Amino acid sequence: MATVIAAHFVSRSSHLSIHALETKANNLSHTGPWTQTITPNGLRSLNTMDKLQMKTQSKAVKKVSATGNGRPAAKIICGHGMNLIFVGAEVGPWSKTGGLGDVLGGLPPAMAARGHRVMTVSPRYDQYKDAWDTSVSVEIKIGDRIETVRFFHSYKRGVDRVFVDHPMFLEKVWGKTGSKIYGPRAGLDYQDNQLRFSLLCLAALEAPRVLNLNSSKNFSGPYGEEVAFIANDWHTALLPCYLKAIYQPMGIYKHAKVAFCIHNIAYQGRFAFSDFPRLNLPDKFKSSFDFIDGYEKPVKGRKINWMKAGILESDRVLTVSPYYAQEVISGVERGVELDNFIRKTGIAGIINGMDVQEWNPVTDKYIDIHYDATTVMDAKPLLKEALQAEVGLPVDRNVPLIGFIGRLEEQKGSDIFVAAISQLVEHNVQIVILGTGKKKFEKQIEHLEVLYPDKARGVAKFNVPLAHMITAGADFMLVPSRFEPCGLIQLHAMRYGTVPIVASTGGLVDTVKEGYTGFQMGALHVECDKIDSADVAAIVKTVARALGTYATAALREMILNCMAQDLSWKGPARMWEKMLLDLEVTGSEPGTEGEEIAPLAKENVPTP
């Protein structure tokens, strides 16, 4: 049992110092404090006329604080388990560009189902319809300015979903969360991303202390300070640094611990070394950030590396599959120059689960015929015909159909797949590709219909219904990733009895067993600036091998093996619990097996 004291509704004690990182970005270099107005729609930048009203409100708040007329302290008794705070730049379905958003969408409810108290903290990029203003704000000192952030909250599937409201998040990607989280377009970052994600880290350290949340029947009041933070990817790498540099020296979060999870080591947060003083960290942290590489971006030579610091300053380092954990310490190529540091700290890999509520062939709202393992062989030919008709291919249930769903970029190997199609269509086969990404790749797949009108189709759109139709209607799902920390497409495919054909990398090795639940083609080259002919040959050879099993008893057995697996978050949640208990945060207790509280009401959430 844990006892905490719930106190206030507005925090004014968090004047955490951090220098402005981009003095000219986004008009942040105004004279004097930069203020915001608080509206039902969140924080917006103030015009000059609004500032008088803001001063009046500020005086009123100070008067209430001085007279002690705020909400009185209350003794709150909480349930058992752990207090877990997941922090990330994305959380599905509210904001998602890939696996990071899926993990923060799916793992926290699974941990809550085991009896733990769970919060996620992420930016409020949009006016999420089911996230409500808590009326709690904190003031964070950034350089010589005081920035106000406000917290919005939604309680879903046993998880406190907390969103950090600030103009740097809300005004940047208004209405287009999915495509503009990190930059105005693919491959281009915002110039003030260091400032944005520093603010996220500081706000995440405040949220467990100041938010008085009472949505759960088992928990109420603030989370307190005996918590385990789970920081995700480079955007949250400053969290353990600020914890050690600012909070713990003041006696705050004395027993808190941080687990740092790497979702994709290719994205590290490398910036000019001259930016380090702007992070407002003591010089003793400089060595954790110090990094030299051979690239000229963002500057040539010495840099700071956020992910390196997150790895070195956290209490535990994890990633999203056991095989990927082996890969990132195998050498410079797959460890992307951080392999030496990870070998020193150690790393554990826990495979991801998947959302078995959204992706369920028994209840899927996007397919006309529902099925399970007992009816799959009758249902899939009909679903294939529906898919063929939808994309304009000749309707023939006897033609093997291969699907591809994913981002059109080098990591996912979409360019290698397209290069192999001219050889693949020599077989009796149809191919359907769905994805968005780099414009040159989108044009490539859209041109497939012209080149192979009876054999291939490419759809360069974000199309959720079609993704479900491909997953259900295809016979095989191709996942030719150059590297893949975990991967979700192969999990979705197996859940629907669609046999995956995968590159032998990362989580694809852990989840797809050769000859039992799919086909392995071997590891592809990780260089993204060219297509290796050996990789094209590997795809062609492995696809031919898979097609050789079509309409055989061997393929039927594979289909049933795929569908017999438990691909939910239950198993991964047990492993995460064990790892987090090993952090030995005061008051932590094991959880119990349980079911998720309720499905996520996605109709109340704007489409990411």
UniProtKB/Swiss-Prot annotation:
Enumerate the InterPro entries for this protein. Answer: Glyco_trans_1 (IPR001296), GS/SS (IPR011835), Starch_synth_cat_dom (IPR013534)
Class in the EC hierarchy, top level: transferase
Q: Name one GO molecular function term.
A: alpha-1,4-glucan glucosyltransferase (UDP-glucose donor) activity
Give the residue ranges for region: Disordered.
587-608
Q: Which organism is it from?
A: Manihot esculenta (Cassava)
> Which keywords accompany this UniProt record?
Amyloplast, Chloroplast, Glycosyltransferase, Plastid, Starch biosynthesis, Transferase, Transit peptide
Q: What does this gene product do?
A: Responsible for the synthesis of amylose in reserve starch.
What does the record say about tissue specificity? Answer: Synthesized in a number of different organs, but most abundantly in tubers.
Family according to the record: Belongs to the glycosyltransferase 1 family. Bacterial/plant glycogen synthase subfamily.
- Which reactions are catalysed by this chain? an NDP-alpha-D-glucose + [(1->4)-alpha-D-glucosyl](n) = [(1->4)-alpha-D-glucosyl](n+1) + a ribonucleoside 5'-diphosphate + H(+)
Question: Does the record's keyword annotation contain Glycosyltransferase?
Answer: yes
Q: Which GO terms describe its cellular component?
A: amyloplast; chloroplast
The main place the protein resides is plastid
Q: Which Pfam families match?
A: Glyco_transf_5, Glycos_transf_1
FT transit peptide = 1-78
Can you name this protein?
Granule-bound starch synthase 1, chloroplastic/amyloplastic
| Example of a GO biological process term | starch biosynthetic process
What is its pathway? Answer: Glycan biosynthesis; starch biosynthesis
In this chain, ADP-alpha-D-glucose is annotated as bound at 96
Assigned EC number = 2.4.1.242
Localization terms from the record: Plastid, Chloroplast; Plastid, Amyloplast
